């Protein structure tokens, strides 16, 4: 595993979503609103994004500078070349947004920011945001592998066009999304009017922030789809605030064994689901690293995302890891406190994952 840090790096947000969900509206807001920030927006083609000549300050081969100081450029293949060109522009940027129309899986774009040394040295992948059409997403999920994978990979979900459906339908849609991806917060929006602060600057790939922002990331609020509990759950079932940061974990009396919980669909999930695992016994550091490396080498193409907080025997700090397909990184972060319930938890989101196999492998890493 490798350590991540991002002092002085430009944060990058990857924007994905099915055709017609509202990505273009969101991008046009970024390019035209007087928000006081200088963003660079990278799109596959300018076709859908309305680049009005009256808004353009100046243009070169494939870069347009807008009146509000933002920049829009197109990429027709070589994302790394476009990023390198942006890095050379005077003034710098507050953030870069990469739109991924036409890609079923945002993974290849996300991986760029981990594997290319020049890009990695100057940018930091901040988050992956999926824009979802509340009115049509259930239909899309039933007939489109792409729509499922976009939700599965996301850190933030903008549930757009909420004014076109009832509250009951919205709850059903949100429950469906949580079955595919139990990790990503859902932001309701109309005409893509989500605050930019909700999707930019989220530090979703910063290991130091994983425990700070979502220490309870395996446990959505009680009563919500995706909450991990069973007959062993050691506290009453009631709603917690989404930003609650104290331990409310299940499994206070689980004993020394692993529990797995998958979030299955009642419609059609094309084999994509989230599987949560917990282990109430310290793990062996070498064993957990070897298991994760082997697992990702064998199944990395099917594992879209993974995150975990691990209690390693003999260590006072928690081991935090994340994975994007076959790329794994981790580091020891923040010491355990007397108030913490020390146990290991991780979640995998991917295709055709075998919960029993994952649970057995995780359990075998116990010290």
Describe these PLM feature segments.
Residues 15, 42, 133, 160-161, ...:
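A secondary-structure boundary/capping signal
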Residues 2-145:
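Nucleotide-state-sensitive switch-loop elements of NTP-binding domains
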């Amino acid at each position: 595993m490798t350590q991540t840090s991002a002092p002085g790096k430009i944060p990058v947000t990857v924007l994905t979503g099915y055709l017609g969900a509202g990505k273009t509206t969101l991008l046009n807001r970024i390019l035209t609103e007087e928000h006081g920030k200088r963003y660079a927006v990278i799109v596959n083609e300018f076709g859908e994004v309305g680049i009005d000549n009256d808004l353009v300050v100046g243009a070169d081969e494939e870069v347009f500078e807008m009146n509000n100081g933002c920049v829009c450029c197109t990429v027709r293949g070589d994302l790394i070349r476009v990023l390198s060109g942006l890095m050379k522009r005077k003034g710098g940027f507050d953030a870069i947004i990469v739109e991924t129309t036409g890609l079923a899986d945002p993974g290849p774009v996300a991986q760029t920011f981990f594997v290319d040394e020049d890009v990695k040295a100057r940018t930091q992948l901040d988050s992956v945001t999926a824009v979802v059409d509340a009115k049509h997403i259930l239909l899309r999920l039933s007939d489109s592998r792409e729509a499922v994978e976009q939700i599965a990979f996301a850190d933030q979900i903008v549930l757009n066009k909420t004014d076109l459906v009832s509250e009951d339908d919205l709850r059903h849609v949100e429950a469906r999304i949580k079955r595919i991806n139990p990790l990503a917060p859902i932001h309701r929006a109309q005409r893509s009017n989500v605050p930019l602060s909700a999707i930019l600057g989220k530090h979703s790939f910063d290991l130091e922030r994983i425990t700070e922002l979502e220490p309870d990331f395996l446990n959505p609020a009680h009563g919500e789809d995706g909450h991990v509990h069973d007959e062993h759950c050691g506290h009453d079932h009631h709603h917690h605030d989404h930003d609650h940061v104290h331990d409310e974990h299940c499994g206070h009396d689980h004993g020394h064994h692993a529990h797995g919980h998958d979030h299955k669909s009642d419609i059609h999930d094309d084999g994509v689901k989230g599987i949560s695992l917990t282990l109430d016994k310290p793990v062996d550091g070498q064993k957990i690293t070897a298991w994760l490396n082997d697992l990702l080498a064998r199944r990395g193409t099917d594992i879209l995302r993974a995150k975990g907080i691990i209690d390693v025997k003999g260590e006072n700090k928690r081991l935090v890891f994340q994975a994007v397909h076959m790329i794994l990184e981790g580091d020891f972060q923040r010491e355990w406190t007397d108030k913490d319930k020390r146990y290991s938890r991780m979640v995998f989101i991917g295709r055709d994952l075998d919960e029993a196999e994952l649970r057995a492998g995780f359990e075998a890493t116990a010290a």
